[in-house]
Each structure stands twice: as structure tokens, then as C-alpha cells.
Amino acid sequence: MLKIFENTLKQVLKAHVRPNKPAVELDPMQKYHKVGEYEVGADDHTPGNEKYILTVYQNDKGILYQALSPQKTDRLAATYIRRFDERLGRFRAFQNRKNGMRYRVLEYLDQFMKQVKEQIRSGNNSINIGVLTDTHYKDTDSVDFYGHNGLIHVREFSYLENFGLLHLKAHLGDWIDGSDPGLISESELIKLRNSFKSARTPFAMIKGNHDENDKFDEHHDLKASFPEDEFEKIMWPTMYNQAALRYVSRYHGVAYFDKDDLRVIFLNTSDVPYIIDENGKKKYDTKLTLAIREDQVEELIEILEGSSGKRIIIMSHGNPINRKGGNAMKYNGRSLHELLVAFNQNQKGRMHSHNVPPEFTLSNDFDFTNVENAKVIAYFCGHRHVEDQFRINGIQYIFFNCSALMGPNHVLTTKYNKNWNRQIDDITEFAGYVVNVDLVKGKIQIFGYGAASSKRVYDI
């Protein structure tokens, strides 16, 4: 792993936004190119600074590999392995052969979580939430954009559970890029699901606009590559099969989690009907159609009506409104925001939709007059591949940066990520968060690792 993990750790943890960094310095074991065995240790930045045998070898295609085996073991199989990449002119980061995680990343996350623990209050009404979003897993070995790194990011994010700090973790959607053939994307979702699910920490699997695989359909002008409810069938049974998550039904992706006086509600902003024409093509491109529909809204209303005594955070992939208060979804974003405002004001009424297709019409009744001591305090979302925040009608809208690698030389890379100059095998390759919601202090603290602000603080 690049030596930047050590040299910039304090800077990343303390600086609000890390500027473009200079040319990176490679790790000491990069110098071993000659086939053979070498004794390496702390001076070579080995795992845990322990003594290892470094074996350098070539495969039958002439590709150079390095493998690390502990000196104190009799096993022949290496624990860590990496290969030389001609595109980079160096070896990649060492990965654990069993789980694919990189030990230098885990060492960095050890320090990150130590810093987080020192800055949060433990006890009642201090809730910690791990947040990851927009991993855009894709079946390509990219060194500067979406690719296999998306799965690695999910596995390394799940490592945060080992510290016993998280009460909940959530992936805010766009698990996959949705640009691979259907069967491949389905297998990607299964790998991601298995890497994210947990017996230790309650988790939310939120759907993103890329998770219907419509990007592949768009580029190939073919029939729908996913059958109806493919994401839902792969991901949601696992999510709903948790005692810690409560729900009205298992059909729409709506669920909620309670801890002390905090309630976290999960929504699906890719709530789009599966309608195909006589040629097998979809009527609605889910990638371009962020929306929420009547049945899902009905479940949200039912949950809100039973939320007395709760401070509430909503989580979804897309943001319903923009910083000017306008609709940020294709359908019903502004209506969703107005419903949350009505809840905070203990109102009673009926929702209406104007100039929307029949599939997206809202006509839900709501009555929040009997709800006591409750408020929606924040709305967490991804989708935009930036960090941002705005407060409208007393609700904090907070955006989280994408975990997916966005190199500076790609058209799709947002300005925010270009400023990070993100690089493979560097701390800027990924991004993730731990959010502390302290209802006693009235603060939301957001701690970021990788291509993320180290700390953001907002009033509740």
C-alpha cells in the first residue's frame, strides 16, 4: 500500500477538506522485482510489523507477483498477495487471499476509528451509524474509475463493525454501476449482499437508480436485462430478515430502526413501475427516473403516525429537493418534503400530485395531530457524488460522497472528486463515514475517511 497512508493520516483526520496531494511515495517492498525469497519485517511495513517471507514469482504469462507468508507458520500458502500492474508501473496493494481486504487500509481504518471514538459521547441517545454509498461495482479491472474496487470498498467498510461502535450501518444505493450484462450484475449484487450483511450490526440495503441495470440497456438498445424486482429479490429478503428492523410490509424497501429516542426510516427513491412494451423494452429508465409512489408513501405515513417521542432521520439514495426547495426527483420529491414538514407541524391533510403520469399519482390522507414530541431532524442521501448540506424548513439535508473511485480524467467525475485527485491504492480511492447522532447535545457529527471531509458538525 502506498506510504501516503502513514504520511497523511493526521492531515486527513484533522483537515476539513484535503487538497490535491503531491506525487505519492511507494511502499518499501516495491523494490523487490527479482524472483526469489526475502525476509521482510517492520522496516518494510509488513502486516502488524511482523516478520514475513516475501516470495517474488512470475506466472505463466510473465506477470510478476509478490506473496507474503508469516515466518512463524509452516503453511505454504501465502496470506497476502499482489501483482505488478504495467499501467501503474508498480505493484498493487497487498490483499488478503481469503477476503480481498488490504491490510494497509485496515491499519488506516484502525486509526480512523480510534479518532472517532475519542470524539463521541457514549451512553443513552448517542447513536453511531456507518454510512456507505455509490460503490458502482463493475466487472472491470479499472485503476482509475468504477470496477472491482467497489466490492473491496464494501468489504473494508464492513471491517468497521469490529470496533463495537456502530449501532447501525447503511448502504445508500448504487451498489452496482448497472452497465454489465444482466447475469453478471445479478452475481455482483449477490457478492455485495453477502459482503454487507451482518449478524453483529443491523443494516439497511437501500436501492439506487443504477441498481436496475438500465445503464446496460441504454448502451445496448436491448430488452430489459433485469427481470422485474430483481434487486428486490436479491437484497431485501436479507434486509427484512432482521429482528432489529421493523416494517409495514416487505414490498417497497421501507423499513425503520429504533435506538433510544432516535428513529431511522429507510425509503426507496427508485420506486418505478416495471412496464415493458411489445419489444421488451422498459417504459421508464430507472436510472433517470427518481420517484416515490403512493403505496410507499402510505407506509411512511403509517410509520410517522406512530412516531411519538422520536427524533427521526430519513435515509434514501436520492434527495427529494434541492437547496432552493425545488423538486430534485422526477416525480414527487417536493411532495415528500412537504409531507415531512407537515409531520413536524402536526398537521392533517391529503396529498395531491399535479402533472404526473397516473402511475405516480399521490392521494394519501395523513393525520399527525396526535403525534407528540416528534420531529424529522435530518435526511441522509447519496446519488450526487459530492458532499453537501442545506437546511430547509428545519430539516437538514446531508449528502455523502461516493465510495466508487472517480479518477480526475473522466468526464463523469464530479468537480468535488476531481479536487480530491483520487488514485487507486491510495486513501483517496474510497470514501466512507461514521455518523454520531447525539440527541443530548443536539449535534450530528459526521466523520469521514478516504475522499471525505474528516469531520462535519450540524445542529439538530
List the model feature ranges, each with a label:
Residues 429, 436-460:
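Acidic, His/Gly-rich catalytic cores of divalent-metal-dependent hydrolytic chemistry
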Residues 125-128, 164-169, 198-204, 260-263, ...:
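Loop/turn elements at helix/coil->beta-strand transitions in domains of secreted/extracellular proteins
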Residues 131-133, 169-174, 203-209, 313-317, ...:
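Active-site neighborhood of phospho(di)ester-bond hydrolases with catalytic His/Asp-centered motifs
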Residues 95-186:
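N-terminal active-site segment of His-dependent metallophosphoesterases
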Residues 135-138, 175-178, 209-214, 269-273, ...:
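Solvent-exposed loop/turn segments at secondary-structure junctions
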Residues 185-186, 277-297, 305-377:
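Active-site-proximal segments of metal-dependent phosphoesterases and phosphodiesterases across multiple
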Residues 108-116, 180-299, 338, 345, ...:
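Extended active-site neighborhood of metal-dependent phosphoesterases/phosphodiesterases
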Residues 7-80:
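Glycine-rich, flexible loop motifs
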